[in-house]
Amino acid sequence: MKQIAVLGLGYFGKSILEELLSLNVEVFIVDRDKEAVDAYRELSSNSVVMDILNVENLRKILPETIDAVIIDMGVEAAILAASYCAKLNIPTIIVKAESETLGEIFTLVGATKVVFPNKEAAKRVTPLLFSSTLLSYMPVSGALSIAELKIPDVLIGKTLAESKLREKYRLNLVSIRDQNGEYALCPASYVFNENDIGLFSGNDADLNKFAVVAPKESGYNRIIEKFMRFIKRKDS
């Protein structure tokens, strides 16, 4: 069983912790707020209230076999925590940062991965502003993303094979969501219906071109232009 520690229960730390608690992992918690720690005490392997963090304290709290640490603290505390975790040779040290500059600092002191929650949230939300068919959007890596889209009118009544998604739109259909909200794989013979919602993977620009294939709203061209400018800025 993997062992993961969450140092700091800010919004990001709590969100990660709640996801971890739903998995088959052993979780360790450290925070200076007793009330925050007590809320998860019974669900974790070890929950500690600690004002001052140092190498020796961490050594006592965390097992030598710890697999990863997630750090969500104030800047100075996060720098120290990342440095201490590096000294303890923890293989994976993930730190939340608010800027690229802080991310570089965290990397220098020992973080193996830096995450930017606000930046990632912006990447997910902004595309939704420009298309009525784009329901959700998740960047994966580089220019690759996964998007939940209403099937455009031009494909309704066609089979998956006839749609030629890869050839025409350079996209892959991962699955189709049914009326019960369940996703299922569909064969090449599947016929697209009016209310179908698909989960697609592909290049950001290709996904967003596909997202505006169907709508015939006023300002259609202006929306496309604005959206593509956004994508170009993000890729630059």
Regions picked out by a protein language model, each given a short descriptive name:
Residues M1-S236:
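Cytosolic regulatory regions of ion transport systems
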